[in-house]
Amino acid sequence: GIYRDPGHLGTAHPFLALTAVLERVTPGQYVALPAFGSGADAILLRTTPALQAWQAKRRLAAQAERARPLPTYGHFLSFRRLVDGEKIEPYSSLMLAWREQESNLRRKAHRCQACGQIHFPPHNVCPKCQSRAEFAKVRLSDRGTIVTFTCDRLAPSPDAPVIMVVVDLDGGGRMFTQLVDAKPDEVAIGKRVEFVFRRFHEGGGAVNYFWKFRLERRG
């Protein structure tokens, strides 16, 4: 069940519980979403026929199957910050996060109007034809193919090694970022991956999120 498997997830938990309920109800039913903390509130929702199309997509059970058990108790302690590890000091700021939200959160890239090249992160000069022509904003595809990768055993991480991948995205564009939920022996050039939105680091006094990849799984 939702309380037995992931445990209580804090702020996100009511919405996860709502998702679990919406997987079982039918159009036209009422669903109450209560939440408590410093006070309490509740939202009353009514399902519509659009629910059935949503239910045909990925379900919570399929998402739970992606979970990878931690190899050792030491990994658990490290993730919970109960043991000291190598310190990292990431930098960020709310101003920077706001200014770059289109690329960092919405995955908006630039398409060169002169040669059609898609590049991410966006630049004011096309890296292919060096044109300074107008650029169109396009959203990067959800999936792509690994071009090359590396397993970094020196970068500070509670779950070493850190797997970094270069991915050619469907429809154009290339991105370099971290691969998660995978072991080094599961990664290979040519494997298909998909984007996931994950916690990145704590910098500038705030939690920062960014896009990472995981191995593609259908269904």
Where are these regions (language model features)?
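Cys/His-rich short segments
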Residues: 88-145
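Claisen-condensing/thiolase-fold acyl-transfer catalytic domains that form or cleave C-C bonds
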Residues: 1-87
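Short aromatic-glycine-enriched beta-strand elements
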Residues: 154-166, 207-210
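Short nucleic-acid-contacting surface segments enriched for D/E, G, S/T with interspersed K/R
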Residues: 181-195
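A generic structural signal for residues embedded in beta-strands
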Residues: 33, 195-196
